[in-house]
Structures are given as C-alpha cells and as structure tokens.
C-alpha cells in the first residue's frame, strides 16, 4: 500500500511537472502568436510604405518628364508659329506686289508704265518674301523624348524581400593590437551592395579559447560601422585577452555573428596595496590621498609596534638586508611603512619583460615620488634613499624641484615639471625610464641590473595621486629606448 502511494506520488509529481511544462509552452505559443501578428503588421506597414515611396518616385519622375515634353512642345510651337506668321505676311505682300505688276503690265499708258515698273522693281528688292528663310526653325520630330523602361521594368519585377546578410569573417592576421588600440578587420564571403552597416561586439576575458557560457565581462556593442574594419582606441588592457565578433546588417535585418576571435591584450596591471601602506595614506585600488589623521586612530598599536621594532631582529637595517625569500611581499601581509616613509607599493611583482604605467599627481603636493623598489625595501626607508629603490622625486617644500634618486644620491632634472609621469621598466635590460606622459619626453633613465623582482612604488606627503595601469608600452617609448640606449642618464650620474 505504501509503495503504491509512493509510486502514485511520483506519478503526480511527474504529471504536475509535465503540466507546468505544457502550460509554459502554451504561454510561449500564445506569445509567439502575438509576436507573429505584431511583426506581420509591422512588415506589411513597412512594405506599403516602401511601395508608396516607390510610387511617389515614379509619379515625380513622370510629372517631371511630362513637363519637359510640354516645355519642348511649347518652345517649338512658338518658333514654328512665329515663322508661319512671318511667312504669311510675306506671302500677302508678295501677292499684292504680283497683282500690281500684272496690272501695270496691262496698262496702255506709257508714261505711268515706266514709273510703275521702276517702283515694282524697287519693291521686289525690298520684299519680305526674298528675305525669308524657307527652312523650318524647329523640327517636328520628338524622337529624343522617347523612353524605354524595359530595364527598369525588369528591375521592378525582380523586387523581392531582403535576404539575410552573409556572415562576416574576421581576419586575425590583419588585426592589430598596439598602443592600447585594437584594429579588427573582416570581410564578407561575397560583396553585398545591400549591406547598410555592421555591428561589432567585444568583451574582455582571461581565457584564450572560445567564449564561455559565463564570463566575468559583458559584451560591449559598437553600432553603425560603415567600413569592414574598426579601431577601438584608449582601451585599458586589464585582462589577458579580448574577444571580438561582428555581424552585417541591411536596412531591415541582421545576419549571424561571425566566429568569435580572441586577441591577446598584454599589459601590466596592478593595484595599490593598502595593507602595507603608511597609515597617513588613504589608499584606494588606483589612487591615494594624504590623510593627516590616519595615524592617530591606533596610537596604542603604534607604540607596541615601535617597541617590537626596537629589537635587533626587527631593526630597519636588518629589514633592508633580508633575503628575498624571507623578505615581506606586497602580496603577503608585509609590515606597514611608518615614520616618514609615506610609501605605498603595488601588489604585483616585475620579474621579467617590459612594462609601462602612468601616474598623475597633484603638483601642489609637498612631496611626491614614483618608481620601483625591491621586495626588501625597509618599512622606514624612504624611496630613493637606499639601494633598494629608484625613483623620481618632486619637492615642493621650499623650492619646487624634480630629482632622480637612488641609494641616497640625487640628480636635479632640468625640465618643466609635468603633472603626469610615464614609467617604463625593462627588467632584463635593467632599464627604468621616466617620461612626461603628455608628449613622451624622456625625463631620466636609470641603468642597473635588477638582482631581485621589483614592485611599483609611490610616496606622497600632503597631496594625492592616481595610477593608470593596463597600458601597453607605447611604440614611441620603445623606439626612443632604442635610440637612447647609450644615454648618459644612469645611476653613475647621480651625486
């Protein structure tokens, strides 16, 4: 009995699910019927509108051509009627003269005959009949106004519904990725004059293969593209790849999307590490503000920290000389910077390759520095004052100056102070260059040999700055590095 009840419950559950499935399908069918009715009305209205437009064009053409025929007829009629009137008057004059000549010829008076003959001769000389052109000024032919609409009629007879556009194909070999721009190039299998525009979709991804059902980033849409290529500019490359697909559209319908194509968008991406920054710095992912009250909220903790760091095991000197394997990392909870080291590090190490990032800072900051540091940078160390960091330093305390600093040596830079600095690091070559990012003017280059991974490093006192990552090394910087490979700007020039 219990088994039968359980079996019946399963049947009831199955029937209920099937009924719900059928009900959902019925709702879907009803919605499809409504959509079909609405779509049919829409396309019928569009069809009637198109034919009305076509009729209007034909009516306008007919009216224009009929008007030209009427104008041509009126012009020729005027010419022929004018010529006819002149000829009629000339004929009347000639007939009168002929009658007068006949009468004179029959006259028996010799005296009057001589004078009359002389007058007739003079009249004939001046008669309009002898000054008229007997060639018609206008032709009666209207053959040049004939028409033959056979070709147009055939075209009209070939009118049909718009075909669905073919699927484009993206040519990976012709696509380009450089200077944070992406150029995508595609073609259609066959030329199609009815294509009105293209729609390009793109999205960021960290997966090289085909798009996944669930991605972290949505498709972004670019509409109204008239050519078979498009360039995205000013893209922040904060993922490893970007996926693209494109479809063609005629006036009324869009075709299928092309096969997605994934392009590599390599760039250096990092965030600022708030966990190890100085407490007077208010740190967001990519920006920092000076906070004078930041270090006062945990006075007791700071005192305990000072007591702990006074021991030989935690002295600044020992911290600065620790082995890289034991050194605190920006990724794994290193000690906070303290005292006058108003420093914040990036959260990503550089141990290979060429990288570029930019920083925009408040030029009214009392002090600001940007560069790179070793993982072993001590928590009391200021940027540029030890052999574990290289930086460019802005000082606004007494007199504004811009200096390059490393290992407590400095060189004043003779240049205008920019508000945005580009930083280029070539780990293998041991090159660290600073640029005015507005015009890519080289400010200074350090040449060294990195023995350990380095980290983006920043310092600010009474000011603020923001970092822009996800940038490729600009091509102008790469070409400039080749030209300036023997530049005198180096560690040796610091004094």
UniProtKB/Swiss-Prot annotation:
Residue ranges of every copy of the B30.2/SPRY domain listed in the record: 281-476
Fibronectin type-III domain boundaries: 164-268
Cited Gene3D superfamilies: 1.20.5.170, 2.60.120.920, Immunoglobulins (2.60.40.10)
Region annotation Disordered: where it falls in the sequence: 306-332
Subcellular locations according to the entry: Cytoplasm, Cytoskeleton, Microtubule organizing center, Centrosome; Nucleus; Cytoplasm; Cleavage furrow
GO BP terms in the entry: cell division; cilium assembly; Notch signaling pathway; regulation of cell division; regulation of mitotic spindle organization
Function: May be involved in microtubule organization and stabilization.
Record's subunit section: Oligomerization is required for binding to microtubules.
PANTHER family (UniProt xref): E3 UBIQUITIN-PROTEIN LIGASE TRIM36-RELATED, FIBRONECTIN TYPE III AND SPRY DOMAIN-CONTAINING PROTEIN 1
Protein name as annotated: Fibronectin type III and SPRY domain-containing protein 1
Gene behind the chain: fsd1
